[in-house]
Curated annotation (Swiss-Prot):
Oligomer status and interactors: Homodimer.
Gene Ontology, cellular component aspect: cytosol
Taxonomy of the source species: Bacteria, Pseudomonadati, Pseudomonadota, Gammaproteobacteria, Vibrionales
Keywords: Amino-acid biosynthesis, Aromatic amino acid biosynthesis, NADP, Oxidoreductase
Full protein name: Shikimate dehydrogenase (NADP(+))
General function of this protein: Involved in the biosynthesis of the chorismate, which leads to the biosynthesis of aromatic amino acids. Catalyzes the reversible NADPH linked reduction of 3-dehydroshikimate (DHSA) to yield shikimate (SA).
Enzyme class: oxidoreductase
Family as reported in the entry's similarity comment: Belongs to the shikimate dehydrogenase family.
Pfam families: SDH_C, Shikimate_DH, Shikimate_dh_N
């Protein structure tokens, strides 16, 4: 009797650049899970139809990336608490009763990566730069680690303020205008995509405390623009978002398959793939 091979995918537009098939294929091999995972381009105006067709044809679960995370949030018939708070969904799973549950594993992936690097979050002073979907998705998991304070700063201050109000019940959260952020922080997280265009947020370089950690959610070959700047101005450690990508994927895999794959070896393989080694 042939073993059934379950289908998973990632939906986005564009999607050619996605590392998710590479990651999940390695996860499947590592855990001996019979599955295939593909990258699927959904039309900008046809995400829901594409995902419905995928599940109707027997798909078990999928990841969702830009620009469809908010649409996936609306599409899901049930939501996890962290997806509700994130206001966006990056993981969908078809349940036995036919319902589709939506989850957001981004924040768990970030925290997992930071802890893997021995970054102490409990009692830390955390600065999050940016107030878009990427920031919103990680705030609750960061606050769950019990930092002393979490400050959100953003070019448009009102967006940072909205997030601070939304998450006030979960810890000490404040919003600050970029030009007023001058104190030192232990963990500085850049959730903006500025590094992709070689730009930097308009922030003072005095934000890096002794032994501080800089974390840029973007990644590429070598240090990102933000991490180069952070190291020049006193950050003791600097990490990019590749580990977060692997961490959120491991969390999605756990939701789908009920077991957590190891991330370290996969991250090494992915880094080699990215550097073209």
């Amino acid at each position: 009797m042939t073993q059934q091979i379950d289908r998973y995918a990632v939906f986005g537009n564009p999607i050619e650049h996605s590392k998710s098939p590479f990651i999940h294929t390695l996860f499947a091999r590592q855990t001996n899970q019979p599955l295939i995972y593909t990258a699927e381009t959904a039309p900008k105006e046809g995400f829901v139809e594409a995902v419905k067709a995928f599940f109707a044809e027997g798909g078990k679960g999928c990841n969702v990336t830009l620009p469809f995370k908010e649409e996936a949030y609306q599409f899901a018939s049930r939501l996890t608490e962290r997806a509700q708070l994130a206001g966006a969904v990056n993981t969908l799973k078809k349940l036995d009763d036919g319902d589709i549950i939506g989850d957001n594993t981004d924040g768990a992936g970030l925290v997992q990566d930071l802890l893997q690097h021995q970054v102490v979050l409990a009692g830390a002073r955390i600065l999050v730069i940016g107030a878009g979907g990427a920031a919103r998705g990680v705030l609750k998991p960061l606050l769950d680690q019990k930092p002393t304070s979490l400050t959100i700063t953003n070019r448009t201050f009102s967006k940072a303020e909205k997030l601070a109000v939304l998450f006030a019940a979960y810890g000490s959260v404040t919003a600050k205008e970029m030009n007023t952020v001058t104190e030192e922080y232990d963990v500085i997280i850049n959730s903006t995509s500025a590094s992709l265009s070689g730009e930097l947020p308009a922030l003072s370089s005095s934000i890096f405390a002794a032994n501080s950690t800089s974390y840029d959610m973007m990644y590429g070959k070598g240090d990102t623009t933000f991490n180069q700047w952070a190291k020049q101005h006193g950050a003791a450690h600097a990490y990019d978002g590749l580990g977060m990508l692997v961490g959120q994927a491991a969390e999605s895999f756990m939701l789908w398959r009920g077991l957590r794959p190891g991330s370290k070896q996969i991250l090494r393989e992915l880094r080699k793939n990215l550097e073209g080694l």
